[in-house]
Structures are given as C-alpha cells and as structure tokens.
Amino acid sequence: MFRKGKKRHSSSSSQSSEISTKSKSVDSSLGGLSRSSTVASLDTDSTKSSGQSNSNSDTCAEFRIKYVGAIEKLKLSEGKDLEGPLDLINYIDVAQQDGKLPFVPPEEEFIMGVSKYGIKVSTSDQYDVLHRHALYLIIRMVCYDDGLGAGKSLLALKTTDASNEEYSLWVYQCNSLEQAQAICKVLSTAFDSVLTSEKP
C-alpha cells in the first residue's frame, strides 16, 4: 500500500471554495492548501438562509459511497478546535497516519440519501441502515481529494449530539470530487429549504 503516497501532488493553482448557508460567495482563504484539487465546505452553523428554496426539497437524492470510518464522542473542547475546513482535513490526516482511520475504505458500497431531514447511509440493498445524521445535528461538511492519486475524494461530516456536549467525525469516500460537491450542494439546498420554511 502507498502509505508514503501521502505526498500531495502539488498544483500551481490550488483552489478552494466554501459553500455556506449564509453566503454562496467564493472563499479563497484556503488557497494555501496542500491538495491538488478543490475543497468544498458546507458550514451549517448558521441561522440565516440565502432565501433560495427548492420545491423538490421533500425528495431524497441518493449517492453511492464507501464508508471510511468515524471518530466518535470527541469532547466539546476537542470539537471547538475543529471549526474550519482545514482543521477537519488536518485532523483526519493525522488520524489516518496514527491508524485511527484507514487510508482506503472496505470495498462495500453504501447508499447515502440526502434530504431535508438529514443524511441516511444504508446498505446497497437499502435493507439495513448504517448511519442516520439528523439535519439539525450536522455542523459542517467538507469534501476534498484524498491525495492518493486515484481521483477519489473524501467527504467528512462533523456532527454533534442532541445535548450539544460531544462531537463526532464521519468520513466517507466518493467516486469523484464532483460527486462529493454534489452531496454538499444537495445538503445546502436542504438547509436553505428548512430555514426558509421556518420564517414567519
């Protein structure tokens, strides 16, 4: 295995974009990222909506992904250090190097369904549910190139528990950065829809 393949392919134009429920503006502050491709981040820690609603928000978009692993029940103090996209990416990198998370996921594919209720990850026959992430418990979603040179991307979710006392990180592998960005976009639309519907 290419453990030493963690060297990132350098690019003369490392770009990044941040998708936020507050704003859809491009944030180039992540330009120093040692990744060869775009990083997209969804910051859901917001109380404002961009005002864009989607009449199809009740539908569930489905994506085929693989499950890399999770780091669960991080203390509040640890979670506070994972505010930005780069914080999450660096934390996952270190966890992989320390053996807490694998570099490559098992071969089994799962179905990730994204709707206004949140995210559901189930087996490919959709008979068993692996994870459920309620929309209101999702704090941030980040997608980025895994750096292994196979064109795969990682999708990382930061969630909290109902009492807001602990954080967890969930890592999934997508077939491409485009697929990962599509998941971020659907989730962003779901947040917009819910926040818009809550307005008086």
UniProtKB/Swiss-Prot annotation:
SMART domains: PTB
GO process annotations (BP): activation of protein kinase B activity; biomineral tissue development; blood vessel diameter maintenance; blood vessel endothelial cell proliferation involved in sprouting angiogenesis; cell differentiation; cell-matrix adhesion; cellular response to fibroblast growth factor stimulus; cellular response to vascular endothelial growth factor stimulus
Natural source organism: Pongo abelii (Sumatran orangutan)
Function recorded in the entry: Key regulator of the integrin-mediated cell-matrix interaction signaling by binding to the ITGB1 cytoplasmic tail and preventing the activation of integrin alpha-5/beta-1 (heterodimer of ITGA5 and ITGB1) by talin or FERMT1. Plays a role in cell proliferation, differentiation, spreading, adhesion and migration in the context of mineralization and bone development and angiogenesis. Stimulates cellular proliferation in a fibronectin-dependent manner.
Protein name (record): Integrin beta-1-binding protein 1
Comp. bias intervals (Low complexity): 11-29, 47-57
Annotated region (Interaction with KRIT1), positions in chain: 136-139
InterPro entries: Integrin-bd_ICAP-1 (IPR019517), PTB/PI_dom (IPR006020)
Amino acid composition bias (Polar residues), ranges on this chain: 34-43
Region (Disordered): 1-57
